[in-house]
Amino acid sequence: MNNSTHYTRLHHLGDASKATLFLQVEWLRSAWRRIGLVFFLTSYLAIQHVYALQGANGAHDPSTIVKSGNVYWIFTTGDGIYGMYSTDLVSWTPGPKPVFAIGTWPSWINAKVPGFAGNFWAPECKFMNGKYYLYYSCSTFGSRVSAIGLATNVTLDPASPNYKWEDQGEVVSTNASSTVNAIDPALFEDADGKLWLTYGSFFGGIRATQLDKLTGKPLDLATQYALANGGVEASYIIRNGSYYYLFINRGACCQGVNSTYNVQVGRSASPTGPYLDKNGVSLNSGGGTSVLATSGHYIGPGQVGFYQENGVTYVSHHYYEGFENGAPKLSLANLQWDAAQWPVLTRDWVGAGRYEITSRNSGKVWDAWGCTGVAGQAIAQGNKASLTCQQWDFTSVGNGEYKITNALGGLAAEVASCSPYLAAKLQLNAYSGLLCQQFKIERANDGSYVFASINGNRVVEVPGASQTAGVQLGLWDYNGCTCQRWTLGSAIVTANTAQKLPELAIYPSPVTQGKFTVDLGNLTLTGQVRVEVLNGQGQLVYQQQFNPKPQVEVTVDKPLAAGMYLVHLSSNSGLLTKKIVVQ
């Protein structure tokens, strides 16, 4: 994060008004580091809900995700160095204790950063040599006197008897006469396996220096490379193919809904630069191609980190939540690459298209129950039958949020009565852009997805983890149940396409006493015709074959228990289907 060392430089230029403005901005930055964690903890304790990608999601300056055993960790700005963890990359929980006990810190910091009060900034963590190397920033408001330190631990599990943070002292420090500012550390390895540290802020820009891979400290601080200048900070470098990509932040940080922070990128064939944007402008000359900026209620994103697992790259970053008066939040975006090998950062995890949505718990699919495609129809889980009413069209409305419409009739999935409350049900309705008709989709570590209603952020689940077909989907607080996880498959309707059949009548409706009649009407049927009745578990409970002519109706006389049933009418002409309710 910025440090107001730039204030002195502006006064030397004789521009006191700019200096005062910069100092005010720096006060906001420093203050936000202190109040952000307090705001988050207060909100978390007051709400007492666990939400999809959220849970304890208050975060500022998050580190790269690092994994210890089966648990994912992120460290953020805060007193003592605040940590948060997740087992699925969806729900996050505060760590039980900070790296350093609140109110304490390594004694060497007092000499390097007089006035330091224990609020550490923008940490970064990397696993190497059998232990975790945690880099942290120490600074104070209104000063360019700063330092980056290092602590190590063999495990991130606080319950382990081997859990112990050991401080390794200073990595790099700066003083009032320095031309760079020692904050915002980040690490990367080049193609030759060399380890590098990038750091710096608005004052002096971004620098890179090589580290000893065993100690994690600089090989030669006298050898440094200037990578970016002109109001930059929060650097991070990754390698893809033959290029290195330097991500930076420009704009105003730490001002809540008024933040203009945005992530930019340049690339180079060498780890030491020069880094050029898409237009060929050097990041040392103010260049930078924007890849993540304010969009909707996601305001001022910054401090990116990249974590790859199972072929997917998660981009950790913070943003200011417009729906919550600018509270800082953690978000995970998705890294993709365009045809010219430039990075694309998006919160969209699902491409536009038609999908079948399958429960990880029951194996059943989202189903517009009744297959009529009318407003108010329940969205339930049903046995997979390749029906049109089991196909769903996904359309991104931005920021990982989607409109989901049924292939039969085009009506949208919505939360009934736009309720944000527990147990609210899903149904079909005409899309009008309401928040209760939009769903935020997050990707869990196992490749499944979580659907959260934008209106209240509760997630879609099969109530009670039911295995029964016909159970209407509803909302609940996220708890990690497989009944809240969904997989997406390409929507493939069988060759004998199931369809809405207004000409196929079944009466009476609802069916009583297990007897009903199928009216063949003016259907064109060829070959042998088969009528099948399947129960809610997909089991065949009745079948009959007949020649279509001269027969114009079929009577099914079978004692059926109360419930929902699927009637199939098949012939050489195709497959027709309809759901019935037996009372």
What are these regions (language model features)?
Residues 1, 51-354, 391-393, 438:
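Carbohydrate-active catalytic/glycan-binding domains of CAZyme proteins
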Residues 35-48:
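Bacterial N-terminal signal peptides
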